[in-house]
Amino acid sequence: MKPLLPERLLACLPTRRAPRLTALFVLTAIACWGEPGARGAASPSSPASAAVLPPDSNETDEPVLVPAAPPVPLPPAASPEAATTPPTSISRPSQAPAQLAPHVAPKLEAFSTWVKTHKGELSFALRDLGSGRELMSDGAGKALNPASNEKLITAAVALSELGPDFKFHVGVLGKLENGVAERLVIRGNGDPTFSYEELRGFAERLVALGLKRVAGDVLVDQSAFDDNYTPPAFEQQPGEWAAFRAPVSAVSLDRNSITLHVFPTQPGKLARVEFEPPGYVSVQGDVRTEKGKKRDHVGLTLKPHGLLLGAEVAGGIPEGDAVVHLTRRIENPEIYAGVVLKRILTTLGVVVVGDAKRGGEDEATELIGRDSVKLAELVQQLGKASDNFYAETLFKTLAAEKRGKPGSAQNAAQVELDWLKARQLGDDGLAISNGSGLYDANRVSARTFTRLLEAAYLDPIISHAYEDQLAIGGLDGTLRARFYALRGRRSVHAKTGTLNKVTALSGYVFGPEQETGVAFSILVSGISAHSEIRQRMDALVLEISDTLWAPHGSAALASR
């Protein structure tokens, strides 16, 4: 199916219960054409629209038509002060067409049979947003490992409990007199976006304020979170240095990761090796620039070196080759930002007498600081990009903000469980240990997810931000390469999930102009054939979309 509008213009169309295409709306969309960062466009620089991404990292009941069931109760409204605009009530869309379940049932039955044949488990639920009733189910109450679909819960609870306008803050504190600071303290409350470039900007601003000497230490105040930097279940893969397994801390830097850059020079000469940010990694070994080679073979081995990192590099890079970039997690973030800030200040000519250490909780005077973007924008890294680091940081932030500092994963899990229980969204077997869904940590049923999706849809405080953070089939995020035939409809808004033997997909399917809509959840456990599972999942969702988009109801469907 060809899109109704060019893809770049499609990216500008609103994602929520849109009005009909009036002349004013068309003019607005055309004006958006020239904006590379427009909402929904695939701009790699914007967290609101992730580029093409790989599947999430490391990452038998018969189908039945369910009789009428009571709608999910509306969630309690969050504080109006947390919203960017005054909240309004959210009306339910029109009820899904009566032929939806009968038309989808054969696809579901075939999928269920395939899962059973391959010794897997299935949890499936389909809920009508118009009536609030569960239309179809297959093991809907069975709690399975949800993989990154857990981020649907973390995003909803964060938006509800913290508010869409919530911002993180990072600052440098101390007392500066006559160019001398007795000490400097970096303090944060969990901002996952804080970068080396921003820290360097802080250092430059300190110099502009007149800083010439730090008589004591550069301290890092990590007190907003507890000292368990490794999220629950991450210990199941202890030797993994990939950045998706980064530790979580109140003060983080560059997502608590480092990047090796290898630049080719002349054949036979040593390649130039640099780590970013500088000053945290001690390096041994070398990489050679090679003549006549077609591919690089750069090796990087990391190991803890006290609170810092040691690195051993080896291998070669072809002459004239592109720069090699390897990003890896750090082990202990306790003083990471302090070590790097001290290094930057020294390069700027500031004398730092002391060392980088943890502490400074009693410092009250902020010299410089900055707020993050709003949570409504930041949370898109969970839905569209499936970012584990952002998810685990938000998870602990929930604990710190709602149960007091230091925030812990255990308290965060309880915040999420209490939130679900208060809204009667959970099923038996519900278990939450971490906020990202990585590893074998959580158990959630498809019915819980569809109830959650309905509750978020109807919540006037979080509804817009929650739907916006989901990937759109055929257009962006982890669904950019899936549902490509539906990109013109923009009908599938969902979250993917992948682990070794887990494949998940949960979200919304909307009819034309979102006049109808359903929440769905498909969880498959025990089968590692991800590609085939996704094809079968997508076929099921496509059938739902086609039914909602059929222009003349059952007569049109019967003629297909």
Language-model features: where?
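A short glycine/serine-rich beta->alpha loop
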Residues: G139-L144, T327, S436-Y439
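N-terminal secretory signal peptides that target proteins for export/translocation
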Residues: M1-R16
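Short active-site loop at a secondary-structure junction
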Residues: S137-V157
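Residue-level preference for non-acidic, small/hydrophobic
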Residues: G132, K151-A158, V218, V251, ...
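Small-residue-rich helix-loop
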Residues: L135-S137, F395-R560
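A short, well-structured edge-of-sheet supersecondary motif
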Residues: W114-D138, K357
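Bacterial N-terminal signal peptides
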Residues: T22-A31
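Conserved serine DD-peptidase/penicillin-binding transpeptidase domain
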Residues: E35-R39, S43-P54, E59-V115, S160-D427, ...
